[in-house]
């Protein structure tokens, strides 16, 4: 399994005992508190917005700037806290939330690793913010809703071939996204956008989606987002921007979320999926699946069949197994085989008894905890205490978050070890352009004026103009490609000269 991918997560933020606290200011405090550790240079490189265009639509048009909602204008430098880290990630303020965007990785296990590093970075940032003079105590949550009507995102990004028809992506992904929440939902107490409805549901995001396809990410949220901003060579690539996922604490859930999606994308790119799994009323189906933790709800397909979400996922799994056998035979890599096996085992257990997966999946682990409280204290789902337990599950503090306490007690299955997570807080992946970005920031940070996913801009002594080094190929700038060069160059001037042939 080899596909460039990444995760960007907006964290929930709370300032206890400060009812008038400004979320934007608190988020900036968090980001700025971590900057001296995450980017320890004499100057802080700014984010390079030049190549960003959030209003370009994959359906072949561009939204007029004056017609766009201000929340869509993510290419404007508003002067908010924004740090590029030595691990190749971005830590910044987005929509009044601190956001961590992982560096580009090439497989779901590495996505888990650098995503988990983001949790540790956020916990450390909040701790350091509290230690500042006049600093607030700030609590961060890796969740998706405040249960007051607001939702904030955990977005996935996948590099795809530009030649893949977008209509095929829409047709095959909508049923998959409607149903994958059975294993990657984070679980939520409350029904409806404001959470006032009584009950428990699989997904934190399902109630906030309104349309099937669209450009927006905060208004009229679509199941398929059409933003066409590849952050790479636009002639060769598109970046599929997936906004429908929950923020997962579980490493297994994150791994399955990205691994299964990557397999489905491979089938779409290769034109392998001939069956049409389209469901009727996808937005309504998305919510109906989420609202039924018994997993018995049956979706109606366009071909007349009725299937549960687990059964429809089994259909995708069967196609994926056929695809892998057809394309690779016995020469399949270990991670692809592992994703397929875990996908199947998970679906079989969900069909038998979901509670068997309390060590693997967030929604099941959370439901197990909540049912314990309900039985001991005879609590209805409307009890405020249950919403507090729900929230505490996502607390990123190692000693306070319920998920982290389950891990400490050996009650959650893991994929990556803590030593690797700690390393990933500071070191970039070796096999994408994030390696070049991160190593440049670590070694030549004082001479980097700006950077982005697709460029690093140097401010060299004796040069009147800034020197832009484009990084439009996500699989160049790797350790194998530039590692020796970076080790050999003693200055940024020497590096840029080597890259440009001395121009």
Swiss-Prot record:
ATP is required for the deamidation and depupylation reactions but is not hydrolyzed during the reactions. Its EC number is 3.4.-.-. Keywords: ATP-binding, Hydrolase, Magnesium, Metal-binding, Nucleotide-binding. The active site is at 94 (proton acceptor). It is an enzyme of class 3 (hydrolase). This is Depupylase. GO terms for molecular function: ATP binding; hydrolase activity, acting on carbon-nitrogen (but not peptide) bonds, in linear amides; metal ion binding; peptidase activity. Its cofactor is ATP. One of its GO terms (biological process) is proteasomal protein catabolic process. ATP binds at residues 101-102, 157, 239. Mg(2+) 2 binds at residues 8, 155, 241. InterPro entries: Pup_deamidase (IPR022366), Pup_ligase/deamidase (IPR004347). Displays depupylase (DPUP) activity, removing conjugated Pup from target proteins; is thus involved in the recycling of Pup and may function similarly to deubiquitinases (DUBs) in eukaryotes to prevent or promote proteasomal degradation of certain proteins. Is also able to catalyze the deamidation of the C-terminal glutamine to glutamate in a variant of the prokaryotic ubiquitin-like protein Pup; however, since Pup from A.cellulolyticus possesses a C-terminal glutamate, this deamidase activity may be of no significance in vivo. Changing residue 94 to A: Abolishes depupylation and deamidation activities. Belongs to the Pup ligase/Pup deamidase family. Pup deamidase subfamily. It comes from the Bacteria. Pathway: Protein degradation; proteasomal Pup-dependent pathway. Likely interacts with the C-terminal half of the prokaryotic ubiquitin-like protein Pup. Mg(2+) 1 binds at residues 8, 92, 99. Changing residue 205 to A: Impairs depupylation and significantly slows deamidation.
């Amino acid at each position: 399994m080899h596909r460039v991918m990444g995760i960007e997560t907006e964290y929930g933020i709370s300032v206890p005992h400060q009812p008038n606290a400004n979320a934007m200011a608190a988020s900036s405090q968090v980001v700025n508190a971590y900057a001296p550790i995450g980017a320890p240079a004499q100057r802080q490189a700014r984010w390079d917005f030049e190549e960003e265009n959030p209003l370009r639509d994959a359906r072949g048009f561009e939204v007029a700037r004056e017609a766009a909602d201000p929340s869509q204008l993510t290419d404007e430098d508003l002067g908010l806290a924004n740090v590029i880290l030595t691990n190749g990630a971005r830590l910044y303020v987005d929509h009044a939330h601190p956001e961590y965007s992982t560096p580009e990785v090439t497989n779901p296990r590495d996505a888990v690793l650098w995503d988990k590093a983001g949790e540790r970075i956020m916990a450390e940032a909040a701790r350091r913010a509290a230690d500042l003079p006049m600093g607030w105590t700030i609590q961060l949550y890796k969740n998706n809703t405040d249960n007051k009507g607001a939702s904030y995102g955990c977005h996935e990004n996948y590099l795809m071939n530009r030649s893949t028809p977008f209509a095929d992506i829409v047709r095959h992904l909508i049923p998959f996204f409607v149903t994958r929440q059975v294993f990657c939902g984070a679980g939520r107490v409350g029904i409806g956008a404001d959470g006032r409805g009584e009950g428990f549901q699989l997904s934190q995001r399902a109630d906030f989606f309104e349309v099937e396809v669209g450009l927006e990410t905060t208004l009229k949220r679509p199941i398929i987002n059409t933003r066409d901003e590849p952050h790479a060579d636009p002639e060769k690539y598109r970046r599929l921007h997936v906004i429908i996922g929950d923020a997962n604490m579980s490493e297994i859930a994150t791994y399955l979320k990205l691994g299964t999606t990557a397999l489905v994308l491979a089938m779409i790119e290769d034109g392998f999926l001939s069956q049409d799994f389209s469901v009727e009323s996808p937005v309504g189906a998305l919510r109906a699946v989420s609202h039924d933790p018994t997993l018995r709800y049956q979706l109606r397909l366009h071909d007349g069949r009725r299937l549960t979400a687990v059964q429809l996922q089994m259909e995708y799994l069967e196609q994926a197994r056929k695809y892998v056998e057809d394309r690779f035979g016995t020469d399949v890599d270990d991670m692809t085989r592992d994703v397929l096996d875990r996908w199947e085992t998970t679906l079989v257990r969900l069909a038998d008894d979901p509670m068997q997966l309390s060590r693997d999946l967030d929604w099941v682990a959370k439901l197990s905890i909540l049912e314990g409280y309900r039985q001991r204290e005879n609590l209805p789902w409307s009890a405020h205490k249950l919403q507090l337990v729900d929230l505490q599950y996502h607390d990123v503090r190692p000693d306070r978050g319920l998920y982290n306490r389950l891990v400490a007690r050996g009650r959650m299955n893991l994929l990556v070890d803590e030593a690797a997570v700690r390393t990933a807080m500071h070191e970039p992946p070796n096999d994408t352009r994030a390696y070049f970005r991160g190593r440049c920031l670590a070694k030549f940070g004082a001479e980097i004026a700006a950077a982005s996913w697709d460029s690093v801009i140097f401010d060299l002594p004796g040069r009147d103009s800034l020197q832009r080094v484009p990084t439009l190929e996500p699989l160049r700038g790797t350790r194998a490609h530039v590692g020796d060069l970076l080790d050999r160059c003693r200055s940024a001037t020497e590096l840029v000269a080597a890259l440009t042939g001395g121009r």
